[in-house]
Amino acid sequence: VLPIQTKEEQEILCSRCNVPFRVDALAYKALTDGEFCGICQFTMDHAGGKILDFSEAPGLYAFEPMFVMGRAALNFIDLCGVHRAFFDAEYPDENLIKSIGFSRNAEGRWEMDLTDFFKEPCKHSQK
């Protein structure tokens, strides 16, 4: 999992995953054996971090790189001092979303508290 360094690359990878290119979003790419397999676009503001797009390249689903990419985005959000995150992307695998650490709040939105989430031991075991 690597941060996408240029908006040009981000736009190309968004196109490969059939998600809208969001010029104001930060982005990570997931790789398996050096091959691109997914993208995550996210933002941060006073309300929290928001994963806006989370998608694998067509035909290239792999749980582990997608999981690591989700956690990498959350770790970056947390390191920036934002300790609440939302998963607002449309993604069909709820088990993966839960494994990353999200749970549905009272309004049905995927949410998580990042406070101390990445401290030893990592709170990787969610309900």
Task: Give the predicted meaning of each segment.
Residues V1-V23, P121-K127:
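Short amphipathic alpha-helix that is part of the acyltransferase structural core
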Residues I4, A25, G101-S103:
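Short glycine-aromatic motifs
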Residues R16-R22, Q41, D53, L114-T115:
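Conserved acyl-donor/pantetheine-binding loop and adjacent beta-alpha core of acyl/acetyltransferases
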Residues I77-E90:
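Conserved GNAT acetyl-CoA-binding A-motif
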Residues E90-G108:
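Conserved active-site alpha-helix within GNAT-family acetyltransferase domains
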